[in-house]
Amino acid sequence: MKIKEMVTSEMPRERLLSHGAKSLSNTELLAILINTGRKGFSSIDISNELLKSASNLNELKKSSINDLIKVKGIGLQKAITLKAAFELGERMGRRAENNRIKITQPSDVADYMIPTMKDLTQEHFVILLLNSKNVVIKETCVFKGTLNSSIVHPREIFSIAVRENANAIIAVHNHPSGDVTPSQEDIITTMRLKECGLILGIDLLDHIIIGDNRFTSLVEAGYFDEND
C-alpha cells in the first residue's frame, strides 16, 4: 500500500502520535526518517527495500553512505539522515552500557557525570550506587534545588541503597556557577552521609562536585581524611 492510499490513522507519523513509537514496525520507523518517496514508490516501499539490503538492523547500522545510496530512492541527504540516526542510537546504547562503568578513581565519576551535569541551571544531587566491585548499578537524582544539609536526608539516600543492594555509594552534585569549591553545606552534608554509611555498612566513597568542565573530589581535597 502506498502512503497516499493509507487512511490518516494508518500513516506512520500519525500512528506514532496516537500509539507511541513502540507501536511502529522497523519499516515504519525508517519510513519516517526517509520522509518522502520517489515517483511510484512511497517511503514505506523504500524502507522495505532498505531493510532487504542488509540481513538485520545491526548490519544496516554498519552501512556506509555509499551503501545506503545504492538503494533506489535513497539520495545523499536521506543517507546522511539515516547515518546520523544510526549513530545517535549507537551513542545512546553506549550511554546505557556506561551506566555500569567501574569506578576506580574520582576522574571516572567526573568523566561519566560532567556531560550531563555541567550545563544544568539548578543544583542536582545524585547518588551513584555501586556493587562490591565498584561497578555502577544505578544512578538516582534524589534532590533538585539549593543544597542544604537539612534537606538532603541520609535516610532517603540509604533506603535507596539498601533497596538496590548497593555495597557503596558516591554522591555527586553540580554547582551551576561553575565554581567547584565545596561550600560549608557541601561539607556538612558529606560528613553526615559518611557517618551514616559507616553505621549501615554502606560506605560513602566520595562526594564529587561538578562545575563547568571541572570537578572537585572531597576525598582528594582531604575532607574524608580529617574525619577518619
Swiss-Prot record:
Binding locations of Zn(2+): 173, 175, 186
Annotated ranges, domain MPN: 102-224
Example of a GO MF term: metal ion binding
Keyword list, A-Z: Hydrolase, Metal-binding, Metalloprotease, Protease, Zinc
Gene Ontology biological process terms from the UniProt entry: proteolysis
Family annotation (SUPFAM superfamilies): JAB1/MPN domain, RuvA domain 2-like
Family: Belongs to the UPF0758 family.
PANTHER family in alphabetical order: DNA REPAIR PROTEIN RADC, UPF0758 PROTEIN YEES-RELATED
Protein's recorded name: UPF0758 protein NWMN_1555
